[in-house]
């Protein structure tokens, strides 16, 4: 794959044979950021599990102490008092049948997080084929099917991120923007890694974290020592 001159210059700063400690890696990620926009800093964690087995799934949510730096649009499926609570907590879209119809008929998914009260799931279940592939389907495990809609909305707005394995046993997760600086990114990084370690399934054997890479949107990957992930 051909990369531009700026990328190649940035890549020269990274020792591909070295496993960096987290602080060094984040510092280097900031140094290798060259885009004109405020790049996102992402972490990619490869785990020693087989995602084909139900007992080796890894997923969860964590509130990053410094947020993600992006504005989060929240949709809530709720009625009555719960709809009012969601609106007061700052949800961008609140409703029931009319929102389901909009999503079904128009394929509308102009939101980042979808929350539902348990009684709405019969209705929301119809949207599985549209919301599922985009990772937007409300789920009790990720705290997005709940009676406490106000808390869920506030957490989503504050920088709660959901992490889950992809088919190749890797978790991809943003930890903030380049403009956050090293300390805030490091704090978010450690919070995420601690949450992933806590979510280790009982069926996982041996060394749980196989590799960790940190990179900005346009920058090269920087490897962190998986034996000293924090």
Curated annotation (Swiss-Prot):
Q: Organism's domain of life?
A: Bacteria
- Keyword Lyase in annotation: no
Subunit info here reads: Part of the 50S ribosomal subunit.
Species of provenance = Caldicellulosiruptor bescii (strain ATCC BAA-1888 / DSM 6725 / KCTC 15123 / Z-1320)
Which HAMAP family does its entry note? Ribosomal_uL1_B (MF_01318_B)
Keyword Cell membrane among record annotations:
no
Q: What is this protein called?
A: Large ribosomal subunit protein uL1
PROSITE patterns tied to this protein = RIBOSOMAL_L1
Record GO terms (molecular function): rRNA binding; structural constituent of ribosome; tRNA binding
């Amino acid at each position: 794959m051909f990369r531009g001159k700026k990328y190649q210059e940035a890549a020269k700063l990274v020792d591909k044979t070295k496993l960096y400690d987290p602080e060094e890696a984040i510092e280097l990620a900031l140094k290798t950021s060259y885009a004109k926009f405020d790049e996102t800093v992402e972490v990619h964690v490869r785990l020693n599990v087989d995602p084909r087995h139900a007992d080796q799934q890894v997923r969860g949510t964590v509130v990053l102490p410094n947020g993600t730096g992006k504005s989060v649009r929240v949709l809530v499926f709720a009625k009555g008092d719960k709809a009012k609570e969601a609106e007061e907590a700052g949800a961008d879209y609140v409703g029931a049948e009319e929102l389901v119809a909009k999503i079904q008929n128009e394929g509308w998914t102009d939101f980042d997080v979808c929350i539902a009260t348990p009684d709405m799931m019969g209705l929301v279940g119809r949207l599985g084929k549209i919301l599922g592939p985009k990772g937007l389907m409300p789920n009790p495990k990720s705290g997005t099917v709940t009676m406490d809609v106000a808390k869920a909305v506030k957490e989503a707005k504050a920088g709660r991120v959901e992490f889950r394995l992809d088919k190749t046993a890797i978790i991809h997760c943003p930890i903030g923007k380049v403009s956050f600086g090293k300390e805030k990114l490091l704090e978010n990084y450690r919070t995420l890694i601690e949450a992933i370690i806590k979510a280790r399934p009982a069926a996982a054997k041996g060394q749980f974290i196989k590799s960790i890479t940190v990179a900005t949107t346009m920058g090269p990957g920087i490897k962190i020592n998986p034996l000293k992930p924090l």
